[in-house]
A protein has these predicted regions:
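Bacterial N-terminal signal peptides that target proteins for export
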Residues: 1-8
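N-terminal signal peptide c-region/cleavage motif recognized by signal peptidases
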Residues: 14-19
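Short N-proximal segments of mature Sec-exported proteins
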Residues: 27-91
Length: 122
């Protein structure tokens, strides 16, 4: 009888996990369009925190690596004072939405294209 009760309890505990798994959030940023969708997530929708956090981490990583690789030949230059991350990412989302041709660019290439246009080095 104990093994049957244990099996039943285990099954009951697994049901909420199975139900939760059906609502998995897709966090892919292969294209600039996908990245803009993550960065522009509606904060009131389910999963928005995960999407926005992914966007912030991904874009920070891209900026750090690309600036480190560039050495003295920077692909873009922050103005002084630099814009906030939220302002920059909001402008990136708008840029992709206004110019749909950019949606198909790779996520890294699209972000760097935007930053180079928006913050050119003088």
């Amino acid at each position: 009888m104990k093994p049957l009760a244990l099996l039943a309890a285990t099954a009951c505990l697994a049901l909420p996990l199975a139900a939760h798994a059906q609502h998995a959030i897709s966090l892919h940023a292969r294209t600039a369009g996908e990245l803009a969708d993550l960065c522009g997530a509606n904060p009131r929708e389910a999963g928005a925190d995960a999407k926005i956090n992914y966007c912030h981490g991904f874009t920070q990583g891209v900026v750090d690596v690309e600036l480190m690789k560039a050495g003295d030949k920077k692909p873009f230059c922050w103005p002084s004072p630099p814009p906030t991350r939220d302002a920059t990412l909001g402008a990136f989302v708008d840029w992709v939405r206004v110019l749909p041709a950019h949606r198909s660019e790779g996520s890294v290439d699209g972000l760097m294209h935007f930053l180079g246009e928006r913050y050119p080095c003088k």
